[in-house]
Amino acid sequence: MNQIDWTEKIAIVTGGGGGMGQAAAKRFADAGARTFVFGRTLESLRETAALSPNIVPVVCDVADPASVAEAMKVVREAGPPFVLIHTAGVNTPDRFLAHADPSKEASAETWKKVMEINVLGVVHMLQAVSGPMAEAGGGRIVVVSSTAGHGFDSFAGVPYTASKWAVHGLLFTARAQLSAHGIALSEYAPGESNTPIVKMRPVQPTPEHKAAMIQTEDCGEALFFMASQAHSMGVIQMPLYQPFGGMPPQIPSPWLPGLEVRMK
């Protein structure tokens, strides 16, 4: 049962140009929230903005604190944000620490990109919204993590998995600090999800594999549910797995050829 009347509430959704960010933005907008979607390019946000008159596109690179500050000025003109849904995140094809094909090993640039967007992006957004939320009496923040950050699997690659472990620790530490200001901080950790990030995989999943993944609409519903609970019964963490309960044996096999640990 939803505990919050979203009419006239202000929501921010990062990574709003597609995937679960787009699904979440539509869900909050349909509930009546004035929904600001953040994304790196206006082109990527136009499709989302066309879904509802309640959706406002705002160009923002969460890895850049100056860009976040400018985007927040647009939001603050409408009022204080009540909810932040942070879905922005990336992965890359070069994701291994050791591999027979050196081109598949994560470069220094890849490490920097993944950490800046996946980890510092969370930091920048938490810092940007926590002050206005506290001044307004509280709010809701739901950050998308991953089961990769909970020890579920390592097939997402080394940089991505490390970044999600970092996010998990960040949220665990920040939760009590924000709660003291009336801000409920939750972590949504889905397993394999059929989002645009799948395109970064070295081996593309089959249609059957994609159908078995968590779908973006389901992610949008889960994020809305988590943000809609009363502060007294907020959802701290929600790991979400596929119906089959994990990655079946036939799925990891394409990743294994060529994988090796080089000791020299």
Language-model segment annotations:
Residues C60-E70, A108:
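The beta1-alpha1 cofactor-binding region of Rossmann-like NAD(H)/NADP(H)-dependent oxidoreductases
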Residues R95-K112:
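Substrate-binding pocket helix/loop in short-chain dehydrogenase/reductase
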Residues G17-G18:
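Conserved glycine-rich cofactor-binding loop
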Residues L126-Q127, F172:
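A short, exposed helix-loop element centered on a Lys and neighboring polar residues
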Residues A33-E47:
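Conserved glycine-rich Rossmann-like NAD(P)H-binding loop of the short-chain dehydrogenase/reductase
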Residues A180, E187-Y188, V203-L259:
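C-terminal helical subdomain
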